[in-house]
Amino acid sequence: MAEEKRDPALETEETAVQPEGASPKKKKEPETLESTLYCWTQALVTAVVSVVLLFTFGVRLISVNGPSMQNTLYTGDELLILNSMFCAFQAGDVVVLNAYNAEEPLSETLVKRIVAVGGQTVDVDPVSGTVTVDGQVLDEPYIKEPTYTTAGTQFPLTLAEDEVFVMGDNRNHSSDSRDIRLGAVNVGYLQGKVLLLLIPGATPETEARDWSRIGVLR
């Protein structure tokens, strides 16, 4: 009768001796319904607390009301705002500010675009409608029409280090830093920077929501 051959590797496995002092492997106990519910509850509570803290101290939602930021923003647009304490404001940012420093109330809050920041000199040509900052003509593809001025802020205007100059993208239908009631805005009055357009309002042309507008503002 032929002798059965054994695989040396298997023999090694079979005769392997557990090292001295090593603890035996424990079988993983199956998860109970209680432990599963506990894990899900813990994750849910953590998520809710994180969202509450985020919206309390970090971000918040606001609605646009008025035509001053067309064609970038429209009435009914819902925006996600990053709190000012986390912002380093720069020219081109779309920001939310309160107008409490205005000589006459303009609105509780305003949504505008920063055109110039502290230390810069801004000027508006009354003939061509071009805006210059520190002598450089701004490239402003976002504005609805050229910028024209009426009696108000005197140009050229050099900003203090803690000021910004803001204007609406719908330049000729916007109360902003060109208006002597508001003027240059102290950065302490900036509530935050617009991060995202979350929900679009209806555009005047189509009276419908254009969902392709959702995203980061430019």
Task: Label the model's feature ranges.
Residues 2-218:
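Extended hydrophobic leader/signal-anchor segments used for secretion and membrane insertion
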